[in-house]
Amino acid sequence: MHKLLDPGPAVLAEAADVYQYPDGKALTDDSIAKAAEGCVGIVTMLMDPITETVLSVPGLRCVSNVAVGYDNIDVAAATKHGVMVTNTPGILDETTADFAFALMMAAARRVVQGDNLVRGTHFKGWAIDMMLGVDVNHATLGLLGIGRIGRAVARRARGFNMRVIYSDTNPLLPDVERDMGVTRVDMHTLLTESDFISIHVPLTEKTQHLIGAAELAMMKPTAVLVNTSRGPVVDEAALVDALKNHRIFAAGLDVYEKEPQVHPGLIAAHNSVLAPHIASASTRTRSEMCAVAARNLATAVRGGRPPNLVNPEALNVPR
């Protein structure tokens, strides 16, 4: 497994002998499969490709992913081979929502550009038209996806007196919408009316390139796009074109289409705020993610049903 933060290693050590991969770099599926030989379970990170090559290793019973998302794992193949897949939901919701709002505000108010200006000794004094941004307060926030993280972002928006609209294939109950002060709209309305769009959908075949050239063209020229979900949800080439030609005001990104590679156009864009996939990176949250992943795997190793089992069908497959 990759290095885990405490108390993860101690939790696992109580259940099994533990081998830790030393340097934390991303692995290939072949190297993971080789490392998994003789193991009943593995702890994986979101950059690890868990393919059928890995899942067919004899004796492997559980893959514990240290993330909410598990698009790096071939869940269908895992189920076919009777391998349980677990994740770490519910832990990082608030921390990720904090960061989504941080990206939103940094992009809207040009914080990174201002920081670079001062550090580059180009600050010559206050001016009425210097570094003009867009207001967050009383703006319209559009949420693409209103799961746990999306709802956490909506709660924060209330403190800024924002109008919150959302689009999701699984709508909230009317009384929940009323209590949260959010309104469900169609995609066209969300794209055309939002001052800020924050993405909170899982990566699936249907959500890949959910935001492309056509969608970006529908957005306001003063709009800000924020993505803390998964990189391939946004067509980066189309986003680069929209930023370069000022079809939208700015973007705040924590995830990338071909991560860890970043489109050079995003790096060159002065109106992009870029972070290295750190939305959940607070000490408390990451430590708890490691602890939950360890408990998931420890439960499976002991013959139990892990609490965060993604594919319960795997329990019915002889292994």
Please annotate each region the language model reported.
Residues I146-G147:
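Glycine-rich Rossmann-fold phosphate-binding loop(s) that bind the pyrophosphate
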Residues V85, T222-R319:
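Rossmann-like dinucleotide-binding domain for NAD(H)/NADP(H)
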Residues Y19, I165, P232:
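Conserved beta-strand positions in the Rossmann-like core of class I SAM-dependent methyltransferases
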